[in-house]
A protein has these predicted regions:
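Membrane-embedded alpha-helical bundles of multi-pass transporters/translocases
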Residues: 2-523
């Protein structure tokens, strides 16, 4: 039995019948299926996005493996892309009464449990080869298979849920809010406030590797269970009304080869624009997020001069996350009214222009917490439409492709989208690691005089005050990664998105889709 038949038979068991009965999108589906459930399912991944690289660097010490720390995340992108394309094909070739994407949420749940546990069971004793193999296999099991199995299906849900533009906009807003909230709560509240000193135990100015490793193993059990729970909750509280249309009309769907879907997408300029938007925008966000814990730990004097730098950096990181999260929270309410008034494309472009200007504020003083926090708020305000509206724009593009091609390309498109959202994480970690390594990053910092910044070579015999900080090259890398990268990508995206005019085709596309369905059903 192949995987698509297995997914169909599994989903059509009575126990896996959706709890959503209404033909219209209602509160339980909105609140649970598109916010609470994905929030839980993506919670662990949000923490990994902010802290997994630091776990590898400071706890497992993978910089001792030389180029491995840089090459693994970058090379793994190949496997992530292949994994997402494979899962996208599974989705497009699955047809069940419970949909074509949702069945893979069931399959993703146990896969996530296994993959997360393996990532944090890396043997710390023994030869380096065993550790490198374990890290490589577990890393790719999570990022190239388990998480894409959920995320590719999850990302398809807005476009498969309904053709009602208003409902789609609301679902896109809530779905993106869940992703943002999981990052805000996980990476900016739970870990920095409650778990920073637990997961990164300090000892003699450095990291207590054994204690930190033990604590990460405990937390991994909680994270894998929360992820699996979120997968199942989203499965039960969502519904694929678009997929049901063809089933109810008895439309016979052929299995679409990858080549046909590829040709149907790559010859359309709107598809390229929206995909390049996600690629560029996400690259800037991930470089920023991956460097945030490093930046807060090493760029603010209040942290460097603290008696407990890890605890202080955790508190400041939490504060920075909360301050930056204020516009994000407000955005849940105002994003769609703004998009209705201006149009989705204009809302995104106008907002990002504001973000570019706001992003320049922090360069008045990159060591000032106040300046950095103010800049984050301004960037957050401007990026509200980009964060909440673009999934609805992607749905419009998918409808436009369906009208032109006569078939939907959700699976392939969302596999590309998922490859970007998941695969870029590893690529950005690799880029950041290579920059930090080249600049001379040290996980304990360099002992120096706090006034003159002169390096103290012999700490044991030095009688003056000592602080541990990174040297100039590392500070420049962190300033670029955390403060400049996203501003640069915003500017590029503004130029790109100004050409996305798919909204003017919406009414014509919906009419054409209905005509195609009637022809296929011989009505």
């Amino acid at each position: 039995m192949n995987i698509t038949n297995f997914a169909k038979k599994l989903a059509e068991k009575p126990v896996f019948k959706t709890r959503i009965k209404s033909d219209q999108v209602k509160l339980s589906e909105i609140a649970i299926g598109y916010f609470l459930a994905p929030f839980c399912a993506m919670f662990a991944n949000a923490i990994f996005g902010a802290y997994l690289n630091r776990y590898y660097v400071d706890v497992l010490g993978w910089t001792k493996f030389g180029a491995f720390a840089t090459l693994l995340p970058i090379v793994s992108v190949i496997f992530v892309v292949l994994g997402n394309l494979m899962i996208g094909q599974w989705i497009d070739n699955t047809r069940s009464t419970q949909g074509k994407a949702r069945p893979y949420m069931i399959i993703a749940a146990p896969m996530l449990i296994i993959a997360i546990i393996l990532m944090f069971m890396t043997p710390t004793k023994g030869n380096n080869a065993v550790q490198m193999i374990w890290i490589a296999v577990s890393y790719n099991m999570y990022y190239a298979l388990a998480y894409p199995c959920f995320y590719c299906a999850h990302s398809s849900m807005v476009s498969l849920s309904t053709r009602n533009s208003e409902s789609r906009g609301l679902l896109a807003t809530l779905s993106n809010a869940a992703m943002v909230a999981s990052a805000g709560v996980g990476a900016s509240i739970v870990v920095p406030i409650l778990l920073q000193s637990f997961l990164f135990v300090t000892k003699e100015g450095g990291i207590d590797v054994d204690a930190s490793y033990s604590h990460w193993r405990i937390i991994s059990i909680v994270l894998c269970l929360v992820s699996a729970f979120g997968c199942m909750l989203e499965y039960y509280f969502t519904r694929e009304r678009i997929t049901e249309e063809t089933i109810n009309l008895n439309v016979k769907e052929e299995k679409l080869p990858l080549k046909k879907q590829l040709e149907g997408c790559i010859h359309n300029k709107y598809w390229w624009i929206i995909i390049l938007y996600f690629l560029i925008f996400q690259f800037g966000q991930l470089i920023k997020n991956s460097s945030m814990s490093f930046y807060v730990r090493w760029m603010f004097d209040s942290v460097i001069n603290s008696a407990n730098p890890e605890q202080t950096s955790g508190a400041l990181m939490s504060t920075l996350g909360l301050v930056g999260g204020i516009p994000t929270a407000v955005g849940m309410v105002v994003a769609w009214p703004i998009a209705r008034k201006l149009g989705k494309k204009r809302a995104v472009v106008t907002g990002l222009c504001f973000s570019v200007v706001g992003g320049l504020v922090c360069f008045l003083n990159v060591h000032s917490f106040g300046m950095v926090a103010a800049s984050m708020v301004l960037k957050g305000i401007g990026s509200i439409p980009a964060m909440y509206v673009t999934m609805a724009l992607l749905s419009d593009v998918l409808d436009h492709l369906e009208a032109k091609n006569g078939f939907r390309s959700d699976g392939f498109t969302m596999s590309v989208y998922s490859s970007i959202m998941v695969g870029l994480s590893g690529l950005c970690i690799g880029v950041l690691n290579s920059l930090l390594t080249f600049a001379g990053y040290s996980n304990t910092g360099i002992a120096c005089n706090p006034q003159t910044l002169e390096i103290v070579e012999n700490v044991a015999n030095y009688t003056g005050q000592i602080v541990y900080r990174q040297m100039g090259g590392v500070e420049q890398v962190l300033a670029f990664a955390f403060l400049a990268a996203d501003v640069i990508t915003y500017a590029v995206v503004i130029i790109l998105m100004s050409r996305l005019d798919v909204e003017k085709h919406i009414e014509e596309d919906q009419k054409k889709i209905k005509e195609n369905q009637k022809k296929a059903a011989n009505i």
